[in-house]
Amino acid sequence: EIAESKTPYKHKELWKIFAVWAVLKGIQLPGWPELNDTPNRRIKGRFDELIKIRKFKESIPDWMDKLGVDELGEKKWGNELNALNQKASVIIRVNSLKTSIDKVQEILSDEDIQTEKIKGFPDALKLVVRKNLFLTNAFKNGFFEIQDASSQLVAPFLQIEEGMKICDVCAGAGGKTLHLSALSKNKGQIIAMDIYKNKLHELKRRAKRNNAFNIETRVIENNKPIKRLYGKIDRLLIDSPCSGLGVLKRNPGSKWNLSLDFLNKIRTAQQDILQKYAPMIKKDGKLVYATCSILPSENELQIDKFLKSEIGKDFKKEDEK
């Protein structure tokens, strides 16, 4: 914006972009002829103007800023954006199938990795200083998985009891599936389903490391494996595909790959998934629908639409406890 350049960049425009970057970073420009006419004062003045505008300050596309305001309101959207632009903490979930949170904290401390417990999250530890956890013996032995604190809230909502038949229908590589296994204490049956075979292969590898032996994976190639489970599941987790707007701090570049067209398609897919998988649940069973988006149109509004549908009319939304 300040360099007044647009893609695809020409050679001259690249010099202008470099000049703007250097001036704003306080770097003295080299005496190269391409930089002789750099307007330092104008660059700084223009920056001071733009930094007051949210879409520039928070670095988001125009359409996304409008969408956020429309769905959340000015104040809440501004607060969410500010939080999403903060550096993400490294959070782990201790694998209770193998060890305890105190033991993992002690083991990591011996490897010069300091952690803190998080109030309200019984299996979570936060790293005081970011370090490579994948090289630790504790990770290699399956004592923990890296999993955001908010993600660790999802599985407990299912209120699992030992011996239940549980289905995770958008399992992916299985972060929440492994948590379900730990909560079930390796008893009962967990069916992890996904359309991507390679992700389920990774889940199998992780499950072996975690000593999670009650997980069965099934690749969804058609509707047959879904319909076979109609009326047979005690607990159903739909960790639905979404825009990912709630985890931009983990993957900030993804916002530039999103579009309204994609968002509309993903909303349609979310409702289709609810309609297709909800009949799996037994009478008096429970369904948890989760996304990593902050948009009501991907969360509350999807649930409200489902509850008004023919398939969803017999479901009742529970209040958060």
Summary of predicted features, one role per range:
Residues 102-321:
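Rossmann-like S-adenosyl-L-methionine
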Residues 1-134, 232:
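Class I Rossmann-like S-adenosyl-L-methionine
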